[in-house]
Amino acid sequence: MQKLFIVLLLFCILRLDAEVDGRTMSHCNQSECQEKCKKKNKNGRCITEFEMNYVYNRCRCN
């Protein structure tokens, strides 16, 4: 019974993780973002934006 509980718990955790990852539309790499913005003589950072039911991780140059 305890093994069944552990299996169900892991299944729920993995499913939740997949749902969260499935709603992230774009990923931002901080080092790539800084390099991209450095060419424009600006500072770059990754920001998180929410639009509808999706999450966007974008690079923003300031």
Swiss-Prot record:
Tissues/organs with expression: Expressed by the venom gland.
Signal peptide span: 1-18
CC annotations in GO: extracellular region
Protein keywords: Disulfide bond, Ion channel impairing toxin, Neurotoxin, Potassium channel impairing toxin, Secreted, Signal, Toxin
Mitochondrion as UniProt keyword: no
Gene Ontology molecular function terms on file: potassium channel regulator activity; toxin activity
Domain notes: Has the structural arrangement of an alpha-helix connected to antiparallel beta-sheets by disulfide bonds (CS-alpha/beta).
Family, similarity comment: Belongs to the short scorpion toxin superfamily. Potassium channel inhibitor family. Alpha-KTx 23 subfamily.
Function recorded in the entry: May block potassium channels.
Protein name: Potassium channel toxin alpha-KTx Tx308
The organism's taxonomic lineage, starting at the top: Eukaryota, Metazoa, Ecdysozoa, Arthropoda, Chelicerata
